[in-house]
Regions:
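Metal- or metallocofactor-binding catalytic centers and their adjacent structured scaffolds
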Residues: 30
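Conserved PLP-binding catalytic core of the aspartate aminotransferase-like
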Residues: 291-293
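Conserved PLP-enzyme active-site core in the AAT-like
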Residues: 2-27, 49-57, 62-262, 269, ...
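N-terminal glycine-/serine-/threonine-rich phosphate-binding loop
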Residues: 42-49
Length: 293
């Protein structure tokens, strides 16, 4: 078989940038690839597969429930839809058909209304929500967040990311307090973050992760959180979620990748330098090239 790079005339990539969507994000380890392959090679009762892998992950992470989705963006859209539909069978099937007389505004700090490769607002709109910005581009306090809430608010959205403004923006714990005071759910997009328990423990009701970034799983996403909300996210499989379906291979691959990720020691700086050193030494043998850690 000719190399894929030759067959399609692709440029070979040495990824020195980390987990970038534009470069193919990550290359899962063999055990994860095996889990993906097992998924591809077998049949399952898919609802059972979704529920039981979700419950297994929830047990590993010590959260109420979890569900594997097709990617973090799909997780945002389906979480928003979940908070608008809230299990109503008519709204589930007619989300975009017309206006529904239920809260649909999603409040987020203005400094979090970013483009992570696609706009956060587009994912909110896909989920049937309307973005309401709180505070200013460079500032959002708990009271500024609260000021944007009204009777039409469905949820608060918090984006935990290097893409966002970091200074003078309230913390996840503070946002959770505002949400609780107003009886609203807090959704946290932690797509590229490394700690799978932190934001849940800080009071978020739903937390969303990208499967191929820190976790180094297949293309997929994880939504974890409070049982009722996760249940409503799962129901979106019969609504907008169908257009962003995750396959059995993605479900089994991510579940195994998370198990491996949690068991793995975090790589130390010294270990990274040790791994880099032979590569750097060989680069330095190339004429005209100077490289250092
Ligand atoms: C990468 C990223 C996403 C999208 O994740 P996908 O799994 O590629 O959909 C969403 N939000 C943030 C902050 C991200 O960094």
């Amino acid at each position: 078989m000719p190399s894929v790079y030759e067959k399609y005339q692709l440029k070979p990539v040495i990824n020195a940038s980390g987990r970038m969507t534009i470069l193919g994000v990550s290359t899962p380890e063999q055990e994860v690839v095996d889990a993906v392959n097992f998924g591809l090679g077998h049949y399952f009762e898919v609802k059972d597969l979704i529920n039981k892998t979700g419950a297994y992950l929830a047990g590993l992470l010590d959260v109420e429930d979890a569900v594997v989705v097709s990617c973090a963006s799909a997780g945002i859209a389906q979480s928003v839809a979940a908070m608008i539909v809230r299990g109503d069978p008519y709204r589930l099937e007619h989300l975009h058909a017309h206006h529904h007389e239920v809260p649909s505004e999603i409040v987020l700090p203005k400094g979090h209304n970013v483009n992570f490769g696609a706009p956060v607002g587009t994912m909110v709109n896909l989920g049937g929500g309307k973005v309401v910005e709180a505070g200013y581009a460079n500032e959002c306090s708990p009271s500024q967040l609260a000021a944007a809430i009204n009777a039409n608010t469905a949820a608060i959205l918090y984006i935990k990311s290097h893409h966002c403004v970091q200074k003078s923006i309230l913390s996840v714990a503070e946002a959770a307090k505002v949400a609780k005071t107003h009886g609203l759910p807090l959704i946290v997009d932690a797509a590229a973050e490394e700690d799978l328990r932190l934001y849940y423990n800080q009071g978020a009701d739903l937390v969303i992760y990208s499967g191929a970034k820190a976790i180094e799983g297949p293309t997929s996403g994880l939504v974890l959180g409070k049982r009722q909300y996760v249940e409503w996210v799962k129901q979106q499989a019969n609504g907008i979620g169908r257009a962003m379906k995750v396959g059995k291979e993605g479900i089994l691959g991510l579940t195994h990748a998370i198990e491996r990720y949690l068991a793995k020691e975090k790589e130390s700086g010294a270990a990274m330098v040790a791994k880099m050193t032979p590569f750097i030494e060989r680069l330095n043998q190339l004429p005209g090239v100077t490289a250092k850690v």
